[in-house]
């Protein structure tokens, strides 16, 4: 739905993409300026609703079944779901947070890997997500190997993060990807 809208609304921007590339989220987003990216994403985020999966995940985080939730989503739905149970986990935006603070991120946190829709910078394009994966390589390796971790947002094969996990996961703690 989002890619279809980008293809319709920004057709002129996508002229130099192949038909196959026009189906690729990262390739399409790379043809939009940040304000256009943010506007199109905000439209979908404003419609997003909490569901039972968000509530269950919030409960797992609150009860320490998961160390951290690492999300590719820009929305705050999980944070809102946590608040329904009077739980207010720290939330971090690693798109703008300095690397020197990464080791201080506690368990029971929600960590936005590609930014937050209300933030200053979003990793949307193929180039920006690859760069972000490289920037977070050590953080991801440390996180997935020191406590149970859950990734949420998409299948993972969509950018360089899946390869990072595949290469660095030792299997000593549970890893979930939903």
Where are these regions (language model features)?
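Conserved catalytic-core helix/loop/strand module for nucleotide-ribose chemistry
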Residues: 1-148, 156-159, 163-178
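Extended basic-aromatic, gly/pro-enriched interface segments that bind polyanionic ligands
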Residues: 153
């Amino acid at each position: 739905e989002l890619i279809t809208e980008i293809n319709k609304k920004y057709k002129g921007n996508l002229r130099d993409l192949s038909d196959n590339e026009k189906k690729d989220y990262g390739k399409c987003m790379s043809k939009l300026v940040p304000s256009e990216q943010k506007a199109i994403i905000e439209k979908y985020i404003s419609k997003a609703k909490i569901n039972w999966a968000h509530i269950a995940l919030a409960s797992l985080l609150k009860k320490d079944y998961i160390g951290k939730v690492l999300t590719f989503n820009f929305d705050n739905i999980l944070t809102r779901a946590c608040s329904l149970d009077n739980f207010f986990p720290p939330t971090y935006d690693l798109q703008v947070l300095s690397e020197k603070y990464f080791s201080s991120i506690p368990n029971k946190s929600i960590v936005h890997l590609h930014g937050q829709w209300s933030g200053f910078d979003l990793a949307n394009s193929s180039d920006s997500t690859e760069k972000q994966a490289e920037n977070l390589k050590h953080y991801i390796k440390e996180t997935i190997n020191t406590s149970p971790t859950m990734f949420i947002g998409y299948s993972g094969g969509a950018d360089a993060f899946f390869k990072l996990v595949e290469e660095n996961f030792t299997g000593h703690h549970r890893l979930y990807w939903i």
